[in-house]
Amino acid sequence: MRHYEIVILVHPDQSSQVPAMVERYQSMIKEKDGKVHRLEDWGRRQLAYSIDKVHKAHYLLMNIESDQGVISELENAFRYNDAVIRSLILKRDHAITKSSLIMQGAEKGKSSRKEKVAAEAEASEEA
């Protein structure tokens, strides 16, 4: 089995369907004895350029281990799903399980905001 990294851009109007789509794709992978090593939902983000007059998209990242047959099925599923506006499948040398730089940046931003709020709360209590 080979390792793959998959990035999926979903139309922003279809964001509510993302959990069902993820479940469907995971079941396709697991039916054929594949494994999902990492799944990240990056949420809605601004596109670098518009695609079909859409300026934002809902991003998903998956790292999987599977056969080529599963990849072909996933490509067909992406191609015929109107909610998917772009997809990219890359072959990787090994399984990637740690969080991506985008998620690390988001977590860092959340922690720094929490620290800032806590510091402001302490300052207001002292005053």
Swiss-Prot record:
CDD domains per UniProt: bS6
Disordered as annotated region, ranges: 104-127
Source superkingdom: Bacteria
Matches recorded under InterPro entries: Ribosomal_bS6, Ribosomal_bS6_sf, Ribosomal_S6_plastid/chlpt, Transl_elong_EF1B/ribsomal_bS6
GO MF assignments: small ribosomal subunit rRNA binding; structural constituent of ribosome
Record key words, sorted: Ribonucleoprotein, Ribosomal protein, RNA-binding, rRNA-binding
CC terms in the record's Gene Ontology section: cytosolic small ribosomal subunit
Record field: compositional bias (Basic and acidic residues): 107-119
GO-annotated biological processes: translation
Similarity comment: Belongs to the bacterial ribosomal protein bS6 family.
Function according to Swiss-Prot or TrEMBL: Binds together with bS18 to 16S ribosomal RNA.
Alphabetized NCBIfam families for the sequence: S6
Stored HAMAP family: Ribosomal_bS6
PANTHER family in UniProt: MITOCHONDRIAL 28S RIBOSOMAL PROTEIN S6, SMALL RIBOSOMAL SUBUNIT PROTEIN BS6M
Protein name per UniProt: Small ribosomal subunit protein bS6
Native organism: Coxiella burnetii (strain RSA 493 / Nine Mile phase I)
Taxonomy of the source species: Bacteria, Pseudomonadati, Pseudomonadota, Gammaproteobacteria, Legionellales
Gene: rpsF
